[in-house]
Amino acid sequence: MEPAEEGEILAHRRFTATKMEYEKIRIIGEGTFGQVILARKGRARYALKKVSKEKEGLSVTTIREVQVLRAMGHPSIVRLIEVVVEPGGDIYMVFPYFPYDLNRFIRSNKMTCSEIKHIFYQIAQGVCYIHSKGIMHRDLKSANILLDQKLNASIADFGMARYTTKTGAYTPGMVTLWYRAPEILLGSSSYTYAVDIWSLGCILTEMYLGHMIFQGSTEMLQLEMVIHACGSINENSYPGVQDLPGFRNFRLPQSPRRIEGIIRKHDASAVELVSKMLCLDPSKRITVEQVVGSKYFEHEARRDASSAGLQGCSYREDRLSLSKRKNVD
């Protein structure tokens, strides 16, 4: 079984699972995570995520995801309905079915500024709630944002999520490469919630451009693309960066900052927010509470959120104590 991260508390006792009562229809997703199957129960449709198992039992990724999802309760976070088991022993996590993910939606539609703000506000609200629980998602990307037919967004895939610790030491190399913050690209294992903010900046930019802005095939190429858009990485733009292992290992190019000009061509109102999210220095990167409170949302998205009772980020006092996290499952 893969090891837990330093300071991470995981309960390895058996999960409560009910008998499989869902009719499988077809596979709708497949990858390193396993399979996602469209299923039916009565007239309702569901998504069944097959749980990965190892010789010693359930993987740490699966245990972590179930624990975290059972602690969640927010309209912008996918709901884990139950865990079911088949007679042969296969285990599935049951979720509501969503017809789209944001990645496919972006590539199939020319999104309006109103749609972008509406969707992104919901994502930011969800991340605000996640962070209020003392959790970093660590895999925010457009493919992990699910959409219903009314463009209501739900954040999914919490296999890489984990609770923050007092030591602040975590596994390096997390987050899908194209959405990975520069501090992780440079080998930091002492990162913060700011890594999720960088990913949010990538998602918002992606919605405007119609494609992901940084598409490196290796960490070095990814860094070069980040530098080309966000400027040179040095002690002026990122104090302390020379202490990171990757800064010594890579010969980084020099470049002026261009990201503001790129976004201004699509929506001038988004320039300031994108600039603050895609800040090279994680200590100066905007917080998710500040994202939610940004003037970027003053007109369309905030009006929509207010009608749904989601005005502002109202979850800051909802962090779990360390003692409660031990029994989060």
From Swiss-Prot:
GO terms for molecular function: ATP binding; RNA polymerase II CTD heptapeptide repeat kinase activity. GO terms for biological process: mRNA processing. The active site is at 139 (proton acceptor). ATP binds at residues 28-36, 49. Residues 22-297 form the Protein kinase domain. Component of the CTDK-I complex. PANTHER family: CELL DIVISION PROTEIN KINASE (PTHR24056). This is Probable CTD kinase subunit alpha homolog. It comes from Encephalitozoon cuniculi (strain GB-M1).
